UniProtKB/Swiss-Prot annotation:
Keywords: Ribonucleoprotein, Ribosomal protein, RNA-binding, rRNA-binding
One Pfam family in the UniProt entry: Ribosomal_S19
A GO term, aspect molecular function: structural constituent of ribosome
Name of the protein this chain belongs to: Small ribosomal subunit protein uS19
Family: Belongs to the universal ribosomal protein uS19 family.
Protein's organism: Chromobacterium violaceum (strain ATCC 12472 / DSM 30191 / JCM 1249 / CCUG 213 / NBRC 12614 / NCIMB 9131 / NCTC 9757 / MK)
GO biological process, one term: translation
Family annotation (NCBIfam families): rpsS_bact
Primary role: Protein S19 forms a complex with S13 that binds strongly to the 16S ribosomal RNA.
GO cellular component: cytoplasm; small ribosomal subunit
InterPro entries registered for this protein in UniProt: Ribosomal_uS19, Ribosomal_uS19_bac-type, Ribosomal_uS19_CS, Ribosomal_uS19_SF
Length: 92
């Protein structure tokens, strides 16, 4: 279910303050955040945001086609190791 248009996109206030501070100083270091629920705004384009995935901070470089998506979509929380192989099939 999509968010109502009249409400606008959700961005955590502390993340927005960090982005404004980085834009003012033109710092190239990644912005560390735990806010996976924040929507990517056009102001974020060109910045690197380190999004927490539950264990580490994954650096995400924000490009133009990411606008409107959530930060958590680009920082995967689960690692897929593959399905267990059938031992009988390997012997043949």
């Amino acid at each position: 279910m999509a968010r109502s248009q009249k409400k606008g996109p959700f961005v955590d206030l502390h993340l927005l303050k960090k982005v404004d501070a980085v834009r003012a100083t033109s710092d190239k270091r990644p912005i560390k955040t735990w806010s996976r629920r924040s929507t990517i705004l056009p102001d974020f384009i060109g910045l690197t945001i380190a999004v927490h995935n539950g264990r580490t901070h994954v650096p995400v470089y924000v490009s133009e086609n990411m606008v409107g998506h959530k930060l958590g979509e680009f920082s995967l929380t689960r690692t897929f190791k593959g399905h267990a192989a059938d031992k009988k099939a390997k012997k043949k």
